[in-house]
Amino acid sequence: MRRIVYQILFPLTTAMIWGSSFVAQSTSADHIGAFTFNAARCFAGFLALLVLIPLFRRFDKQPVQPLSPQEKKAHFRGLIWGGFCCGTALALACNLQQLGMVAGASAGKTSFITTMYVVLVPICGLFLKKKVPLTVWLGVMIAVAGLYCLCIKEDFTIVFSDFLVLLCAFAYTLQILVIDHFAPHYDGVALSCVQFFFTAVWSAVCMLVFEGDQLSWTALLSCMGEILYVGIFSGGLAYTLQILAQKESRNPTMVSLLLSLESVFGVLAGAIFLQEKMSGKEYLGCVLMLIAVVLAQLPAPKRKIAAIE
């Protein structure tokens, strides 16, 4: 039962929360600016994670090695620096995504274009001298075809809103690589908490610079439900469930595949709550993107793994 909860229920719940959060982002985009929304939701996520840190540590069974006062200070400084780097990358990613939605990108299309990062991350491993499995290269080719169906119009142009979301996928790739660098050295939830704080700070600075004259407390309060949902549930709860699933699961491939269903739930939520509709070509693009994401996460055959080692 415990394995079912951690390996299936937790990642599936996380994917549902992340997918449905695109609806909240889309409805907020009609009322407040991208930087205002992200400043508020990331601050809410920061507070949520601050509360969840003690709860998460109850589930963390790994022994903690005692540190000297000097080591604690060095560890804390490293945590802050790691959170700053991760938060800067996340601020770039989530603001590009929200700007794309403000410019008109639908919730469903945004969810699928964003998942392009799942394919891009292994490719970026080439620069770190990591082997890229054949399934990933196949996924890249299918993803390119999927992006063509989703984004490219009949006159071979791309809508500006889709272009911003595509840039967001590259920014999320950077953010994941930065997290991959710092995560092994620090508590995952604590790192995410600091990350959300700096993302909120960067977004607030951009809000004051670019949206200061448009800031309306009435509009902000009207979107408070969406802000709290995305901040607390998508940022705080879902991230914690993801970490618990990845720590406890004996099958990381299944967990990652279930998490990638975020894009499917995004399209379903957009259709149910926003009555969004896509063309046949765009639905084909969604299917191709999902196939590409699944291929990118499949483990390489054992013979190839042995050859690489």
Task: Go through each PLM region and give its residues.
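Glycine-/small-residue-enriched transmembrane alpha-helix faces in small-molecule transporters
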Residues: 1-40, 88, 92, 96, ...
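Transmembrane alpha-helices of multi-pass small-molecule transport proteins
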Residues: 7, 31-92, 118-124, 171-178, ...
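Specific transmembrane alpha-helical segments of multi-pass solute transporters/efflux pumps
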Residues: 21, 56-113, 147-149, 231-249
